[in-house]
């Protein structure tokens, strides 16, 4: 399967108010520290897997004000356009705050965030969206291909399992038979 990242659009994602990146076969993203390079990778991973580029599920996606406080009442949106074997798909994740005004209360209170998902503009349930993404690429494999720390951060047994998946058909008996000193 051939997968190409064609476009990434971010709205109110971390420090990025509104940005679209059109990707070519080679796209260079560079800059000084703290200008948003990792934000691009985080947005991509958040849209596909609900994690940042380090594989962490809990991280701040909401933009912050000058004092480091989350900015409320803004919609966070990331749209990714992928070419999968010649067919384009647009995957979109939007996060909205759930504000509820209880009876008798003067102000609404934040009751959490709602994540909304779309594939090619059609709303999808989270499980259907995740299943669609999983058909394109396995999250663990994607982490191994894109994050140099993904493999070394695994426990040795998990590392061994990953290596054995990459070289199928080799079992312990074959290895032992090939080397009499083992």
Feature map (PLM): residue ranges:
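Post-Walker A helix-loop "phosphate-sensing" segment adjacent to the P-loop in P-loop NTPases
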Residues: 47-57
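Nucleotide-state sensing region of NTPase/ATPase domains
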Residues: 57-144
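Conserved ABC ATPase signature
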Residues: 30-35, 39, 116-126, 155
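Alpha-helical scaffold elements adjacent to nucleotide-binding pockets in ATP/GTP-utilizing enzyme cores
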Residues: 40-43, 92, 128, 132, ...
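A short beta-strand motif that forms part of the nucleic acid-binding face
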Residues: 23-25, 94-97, 167
């Amino acid at each position: 399967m051939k997968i190409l990242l064609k476009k990434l659009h971010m709205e109110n994602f971390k420090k990025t108010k509104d940005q679209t990146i059109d990707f070519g076969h080679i796209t260079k993203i560079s800059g000084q520290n703290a200008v948003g390079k990792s934000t691009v990778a985080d947005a991509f991973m958040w849209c596909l897997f609900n994690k940042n580029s380090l594989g962490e599920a809990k991280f701040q996606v909401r933009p912050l004000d000058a004092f480091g406080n989350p900015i409320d009442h803004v919609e966070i949106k990331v749209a990714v356009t992928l070419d999968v074997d010649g067919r384009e798909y647009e995957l979109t994740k939007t996060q909205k705050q759930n504000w509820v005004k209880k009876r008798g209360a003067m102000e609404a209170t934040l009751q959490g965030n709602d994540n909304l998902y779309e594939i090619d503009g059609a709303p999808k349930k989270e499980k259907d969206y995740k299943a669609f993404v999983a058909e394109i690429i396995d999250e663990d494999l994607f982490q191994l291909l894109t994050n140099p720390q993904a493999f070394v951060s695994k426990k040795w047994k998990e590392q061994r399992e990953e290596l054995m998946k990459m070289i199928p058909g080799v079992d312990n008996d074959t290895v032992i038979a090939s080397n009499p000193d083992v």
